[in-house]
Amino acid sequence: MSNLFKKAAVFTDLHLGYKQNSQLFLNDCDRFMDWFLNLVKTEECDTVLFLGDFHDTRNSLNINTMDHSIRILDRLNNLGLRVLFIPGNHDLYHKDRRTVTSIRYIEKFKNIELIMDQHTEGDVTFVPWLIGEEYKNMRKIKSKYVMGHFELPSFLMNARVEMPDHGGLKADDLNGVDTVFTGHFHKRQIKGNVHYIGNAFPHNYADAWDDERGAMILQWGADPVYHNWTSAPRYRTLNLIQMLESPEEHLDDRTYARVQLDVSISYEEANFIKEEMQKTYGVRELSLIQHRGEVLTENAIGDVAFESVDQIVLSQISNLDTQHYDTRLLMEIYNSL
């Protein structure tokens, strides 16, 4: 049996349409693809693999987002290489079956293949987002590599939250293979034979200070090599003194920053700081968080609006990506406290 590839470029969890179909986020996706396609060519890869969550919203697809999606697929197709996609949970309309997906039109591209069910080829097994009790079949896999979109307990969902064990698939169920590469959790992490390769780029403040995102190059039989996209958006949480001492180190036109006020300042001073940081460094977002629980956040240069810390917490809850937590219920519980 011949190997599926000699050298593969692997990426995951692009989430086109995130941030309510933000144009800036879509532009970041386009910039990522510029970098990724150059990496594919530089590394002389013969295969491209995508491990799920091409789109973000599972029940609708914005026209502008779809336009960017098709353009990205067209660029991948034009590589002239074999490109294989599996759907993640965000790509599926139903939670209990894989019959409807927002990436079905991938099949119209000559060089791109959509793998909707477990499939083994060339000693590689592809496993899309698992449904129901499909996880029970994972122990039977004996391939050298598994490429999947798994939700495994004891791994970090983000830098702060570990996935609890709710039953279902466990890492031990995949011990029959040499190495597992998976999407779903966005933080790059390795434990045993399981590699969460990390998503394309940081998406929100759950990714603060965690810039190890980008893509993986896998030469058959060799250790994977991870490449960071150094021009990615970045999220920072820091205090005011820290920011003012070395703003050039922390702020640029790719930065989203939440700044804790560790000294007392007036609204006028806050306006001045925000205006100067925006003018000098072009930061995308700068929120000043006061100890008493108010947030000074920028709507326009020179204006200070208020946002509650509660909104920040609720935003973090809504960003949890797992089928085992009911985020609406968590938000209701938090609001009742």
Region locations from a protein language model:
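Active-site environment of divalent metal-dependent phosphoester hydrolases
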Residues: 15-19, 56-59, 85-96, 132-134, ...
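Accessory, non-catalytic peripheral segments of nucleic-acid enzymes
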Residues: 3, 42, 219-337
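Structural motif
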Residues: 6-8, 47, 122-123, 145, ...
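Conserved beta-sheet core of the metallophosphoesterase superfamily
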Residues: 159-223
